[in-house]
Amino acid sequence: MASLKDMRVRIASTKATQKITKAMQMVAASKLRRAQMAAEAARPYAEKMDAVISNIAGAAAGSPGAPVLLAGTGKDQVHLLLVCTGERGLSGAFNSSIVRLARERAYALMNQGKTVKFFCVGRKGYEQLRRTFDKQIIENIELRSVRQLGFVNAEDIAQKVIARFNNGEFDVCTLFYSRFKSVISQIPTAQQLIPLVVEAPAAGSVATSYEYEPEEDEILSTLLPRNLAVQIFRALLENNASFYGAQMSAMDNATRNAGDMIRKQTLIYNRTRQAMITKELIEIISGAEAI
């Protein structure tokens, strides 16, 4: 049985840990609001741009001059999974849930005889995926040194993806990230980027015909690479908000658990101390009676 000194050390250690988790919770809460506002502000632009491009692409999809980012390679053999995760842990299941979704997709594709490659953005995703897919990871980008996420970061990733696509390294690219819903809810999401998926018009909607100048193909050649960067930037912002939400929730749970441990350890300490005092009193009384 542990001595009273060991128990005091354990209680003090748990209290110190509780202070750390409480501080991390407060830091995450302060950063969450800004990250949430950035993610929510990016959604309308990204969704509207996707809708505009889908409208233009609907008319150009069948033309022989359609951009390759829209038309694709005509094959469905090599898949690139662009997996965006965080740079740090202590955030509950935030990173592992994204990796799990990507891993499930990879196994499903491999069972169909497809070739799977990984493009990792974020240290935690890379560390988890390399355990089983080390030889299939073709690139890894870490954003640890980036203090404030900017569109330039997404553009850099998009340019590297497009360069590999133009080199014929893959046929289909799918983006994996975590969509922020609330502090306690982040949704792992998969979104196909290449070739662009043109959404069918909603049932009952009236199709509107537009005339474009210059031609649709020329407009798409400019807009498609930018849309790729916009969708990646949106994913990075969603991930950022999801990370702080998950970390805030995880640190809150850790703080509560530390409080429960302190109460239990203190109760055991007091009972042990009381038992030792009672034992000593009995020994003193027994000795006095013997005299």
Curated annotation (Swiss-Prot):
One of its GO terms (biological process) is proton motive force-driven plasma membrane ATP synthesis. It holds the Pfam family ATP-synt. Keywords: ATP synthesis, Cell inner membrane, Cell membrane, CF(1), Hydrogen ion transport, Ion transport, Membrane, Transport. PROSITE patterns: ATPASE_GAMMA. It is found in: Cell inner membrane. The keyword Magnesium does not apply. InterPro entries: ATP_synth_F1_ATPase_gsu (IPR035968), ATP_synth_F1_gsu (IPR000131), ATP_synth_F1_gsu_CS (IPR023632). One of its GO terms (cellular component) is plasma membrane. It comes from the Bacteria. GO terms for molecular function: ATP binding; proton-transporting ATP synthase activity, rotational mechanism. SUPFAM superfamilies: ATP synthase (F1-ATPase), gamma subunit (SSF52943). It is a peripheral membrane protein. The keyword Cell inner membrane applies. Produces ATP from ADP in the presence of a proton gradient across the membrane. The gamma chain is believed to be important in regulating ATPase activity and the flow of protons through the CF(0) complex. Belongs to the ATPase gamma chain family. PANTHER family: ATP SYNTHASE GAMMA CHAIN, ATP SYNTHASE SUBUNIT GAMMA, MITOCHONDRIAL. HAMAP family: ATP_synth_gamma_bact. F-type ATPases have 2 components, CF(1) - the catalytic core - and CF(0) - the membrane proton channel. CF(1) has five subunits: alpha(3), beta(3), gamma(1), delta(1), epsilon(1). CF(0) has three main subunits: a, b and c. This is ATP synthase gamma chain. The lineage of its organism: Bacteria, Pseudomonadati, Pseudomonadota, Alphaproteobacteria, Hyphomicrobiales.
